[in-house]
């Protein structure tokens, strides 16, 4: 644990893991590739020996579903009456399931994207919650999602859970409006193709996307190539 970490342990950890053996190098832009690679090799990589064994990824095995109650802090002046939250999480595949990640991002927008989205609308109209969102956590060995509903009163917790699961079951049985799915899919595709990263350098974002697969043994370019994924999803949204 950090409070018990000694300086010697810190140095040992640094020397073991902050090493080219545990590094991923990527280049971005129109650079003289041969010259840059030669420079990296001569000035940096060739003088060091590999000292870190390559370990395969460790997957989280399925666990028994459990209910956990956790306290969290609020401000002294805040009213705790409607500060309850409910959340459900689930693994949705591995780093290789990029098509599933994009499909889940579409589903997140359909379910919780705005106040007229399916789950938002039913809970807001009944005054049972203030926020509903479905977070998709990708770029990891195992991607996962979390559906969260917040600003709930304690006496409404069971009702909120019932409405959430009933609504999802109805969608499973009746399906989601195809036009809505296609519109959301088109919007997401446009955003990705425009490569608008909100002011962040494009090369840095590309590097992060490369690592989302490369870190776990996948192809570096896997999460940069999504044209076919959208084509497949359009055929069967």
Name each model-derived stretch.
Residues 1-58, 62, 79-87, 92-97, ...:
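Charge-rich, well-structured scaffold segments of protease-associated domains
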Residues 64-69:
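Intrinsically disordered, low-complexity regulatory segments
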Residues 71-78:
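Edge strands and adjacent loops of beta-rich recognition modules
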């Amino acid at each position: 644990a950090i409070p018990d970490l000694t300086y010697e342990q810190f140095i040992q950890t640094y020397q073991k893991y902050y090493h080219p053996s545990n590094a991923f190098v990527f280049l971005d832009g129109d650079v003289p590739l041969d010259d840059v690679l030669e420079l990296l090799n001569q000035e940096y990589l060739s003088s060091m020996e590999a000292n870190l064994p390559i370990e395969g990824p460790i997957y989280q095995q399925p666990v028994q579903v459990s209910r956990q109650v956790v306290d969290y802090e609020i401000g002294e002046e805040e009213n705790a009456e409607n500060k309850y939250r409910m959340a459900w999480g689930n693994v949705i595949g591995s780093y290789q399931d990029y098509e599933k990640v994009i499909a889940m991002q579409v589903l997140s927008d359909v379910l919780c994207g705005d106040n007229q989205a399916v789950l938002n609308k039913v809970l807001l109209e009944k005054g049972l919650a203030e926020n509903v969102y479905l977070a998709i956590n990708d770029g990891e060995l195992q991607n996962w999602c979390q559906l969260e509903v917040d600003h709930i009163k304690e006496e409404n917790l069971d009702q909120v859970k019932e409405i959430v699961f009933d609504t999802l079951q109805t969608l499973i049985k009746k399906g989601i409006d195809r036009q809505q799915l296609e519109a959301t899919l088109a919007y997401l595709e446009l955003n990705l193709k425009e490569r608008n990263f909100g002011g962040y350098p494009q090369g840095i974002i590309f590097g992060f996307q490369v690592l989302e697969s490369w870190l776990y043994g996948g192809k570096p370019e896997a999460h940069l190539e999504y044209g076919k994924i959208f084509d497949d999803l359009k055929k069967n949204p």
